[in-house]
Amino acid sequence: MQKRICIIGGNGEMGQMTQNIFSKFLPEYALTIFDESDWQTPEQKLANQDIVILSVPIYLTDEIIKKTIPYLSEGTILADYTSIKKEPLDSMLANYDGPVVGLHPIFGPTISSPENQVIVVCDGKQQDKYQYFIDDLARIGFSIEKMTAEEHDEAMTFIQGIEHFSVYCLGLFLKHKNVDIQKMLKLASPVYKMELNIVGRLFSQGPGLYADIIMSDKQRQQTIAEFAEFVNSNAEKVSDGDKQTFIENFKAVKEWMGDFAPQSYKNTDKLLLKKKGYE
């Protein structure tokens, strides 16, 4: 039996990715795109759906959840793609009586295959009603990682918050110093060239998206502020020429990382060998 699924914000990049993946790999799902103009007559697209997924900016998520719920049919699964999970999941649970699940696709909108792409699943309520959908995602190749919303958000504070903030600051500082990027690329080692490409990749995308991600919640903002203070304290030691403290800290981190450090060296070597032709 064909399932009906509606993506609110479906004309955005992640919505378009969902449409492309489902048309190729899950043709048994009839997908409907819901965009801003559809709020004139929302019941026409939201009623009688098996699944409704919100793919909207973080700052709009709570508002859209509350705006959507009155038009859902009984038993419709309500889910979201938001890159933070606790706040939207709490909102869906508090305001909707039907099945609820939080999803976070850990990949960009340019993927052409679901193979080995990670989707985080945060259980909400009435899991027996939505488990078939999660099973279908796994069946076509997505790697499903289940965790609580709290575990997800704590991890994403570092994976997205600290990481994106660090890259943002590096790009900002390169501009501040008016660095000639093309000259740097000519002189850069493969590893540094990769790092520069990561900076360029971030700034090729929308600033609003990264503002939302980096400043998504108070915990993330506070952790980034703590990180900045930590960097400043270490920068002072470098400015003082305190090599001894630097070496001790370096050794301590290396020991703390254990096998991850040498394995990372091997992994990046393999990656660089595969991608040696990139500019």
Task: Enumerate the language-model features and the residues they cover.
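NAD(P)+-binding Rossmann beta1-loop-alpha1 motif at the extreme N-terminus of oxidoreductases
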Residues: M1-Q44
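Conserved N-terminal glycine/acidic-rich loop preference
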Residues: Q2, N11-M14, D50-L54, G98
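Rossmann-like NAD(P)-binding element
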Residues: Q44-I69
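Glycine-rich, N-terminal phosphate-binding loop of Rossmann-like dinucleotide-binding domains
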Residues: S55-P57, T82, D123
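ADP-ribose/adenylate-binding Rossmann-like module
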Residues: Y71-E87
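Rossmann-fold dinucleotide-binding core
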Residues: K85, S91-H152, M156
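An accessory alpha-helical subdomain
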Residues: T148-E279
